[in-house]
Swiss-Prot record:
GN (gene name): KO
GO biological process: ent-kaurene oxidation to kaurenoic acid; gibberellic acid mediated signaling pathway; gibberellin biosynthetic process
Entries under PANTHER family matching the protein: ENT-KAURENE OXIDASE, CHLOROPLASTIC
All ranges on the Cytoplasmic side of the membrane: 24-509
Protein name (Swiss-Prot/TrEMBL): Ent-kaurene oxidase, chloroplastic
This protein's pathway: Plant hormone biosynthesis; gibberellin biosynthesis
Residue ranges of the TM segments: 3-23
Major localisation: plastid
Amino acid sequence: MAFFSMISILLGFVISSFIFIFFFKKLLSFSRKNMSEVSTLPSVPVVPGFPVIGNLLQLKEKKPHKTFTRWSEIYGPIYSIKMGSSSLIVLNSTETAKEAMVTRFSSISTRKLSNALTVLTCDKSMVATSDYDDFHKLVKRCLLNGLLGANAQKRKRHYRDALIENVSSKLHAHARDHPQEPVNFRAIFEHELFGVALKQAFGKDVESIYVKELGVTLSKDEIFKVLVHDMMEGAIDVDWRDFFPYLKWIPNKSFEARIQQKHKRRLAVMNALIQDRLKQNGSESDDDCYLNFLMSEAKTLTKEQIAILVWETIIETADTTLVTTEWAIYELAKHPSVQDRLCKEIQNVCGGEKFKEEQLSQVPYLNGVFHETLRKYSPAPLVPIRYAHEDTQIGGYHVPAGSEIAINIYGCNMDKKRWERPEDWWPERFLDDGKYETSDLHKTMAFGAGKRVCAGALQASLMAGIAIGRLVQEFEWKLRDGEEENVDTYGLTSQKLYPLMAIINPRRS
């Protein structure tokens, strides 16, 4: 019996082995066939450049998203450029961008960061810059459950209500005390937004903090500079070694000193804020803050990772909503007829009552204003570079493993084949028979697509939507003389280079 039992086991093993080998060969054959099909596709068109430096001199405008968009009119929606010794494939249409973000995601899910961003993100310790792995899934789940998801945003509603009431109060005070004098809209809105960011992160606003590592007490404005302004400045700092990786062994001391100083100051301030929060017993702060959530739900994270993840929520809240709201008010002030139409729509919905979040779905024209502003002034004109870790295809072209890929959101939103008069700000393009469609949220690509879609889309929509609505409901906005030409942006971002200066007149209740 033992002999026959052994024979039976051996026979089963042999049969299983043959089955495994058969299917493995089939799988290998299928894989090779697919790879063969990919490799026979044409190569991505190449933008002519110079020896050694490639196309770097052609990017001297320092606004690559605009240069990339102009090139797309010549070379098509997908092309390759040389950044020093590195090749970069640039995508400039919604179709190719969605293909990379959704259809080919499994082949292009890795981030490729500049030397500056590698330091400032603590080597991809942020949700937005981490590779799509277990760490990313954990921290994004925490971000949605603890702060940016639908349920979490309901819990944070009182922060948004206080934000718009404070902004409204300060604007009314300016109109009363300095009638017909331009108001610096950014100074007011930015200050209040930063307060909301701190409350969500630490449970309370912070007017000043003693930073032991720096030996100084910083005011709220100084905290903002360290945590937001300096980081935006550092993110676009250029290290020539990014373009010539084979020379990375050569020191670039001035660059390294600048970035490390910003990074260390940011961590020092974050550590001070975290320690201050941990000392609170709940009497002065809201226990439902993101720091508490991370510390209780993600115990595998290091202290530095927690600091960076909490900081990420601050910069996202304080920056994205500001960019969109400021540009929307600028365009509304520039186009009085659009402003009047929006004001009438809000009046028809609210009557004499204040506009509220619950009414956002009832104002399609306001939603058109919001999405058209996102289209023309996307807060992130360029998506952080991605890396193809295997051969794939995009737009009918072969993309070899090792390719670096840049998605030009600005170019997608200025594509003349997709958008009528893309250079014009025209909210009506988002209206379908006078109705707002929820799918409009993804038409502009401003929040990305697929598994890496921006976690902050809901918060940005709520904050900017209610802010724009209330500001137009309560004030008539006009640009000061010369303000219409103030359209320059800061570095690689869409933020206005100069703060919006407008003349406001309170509307009658």
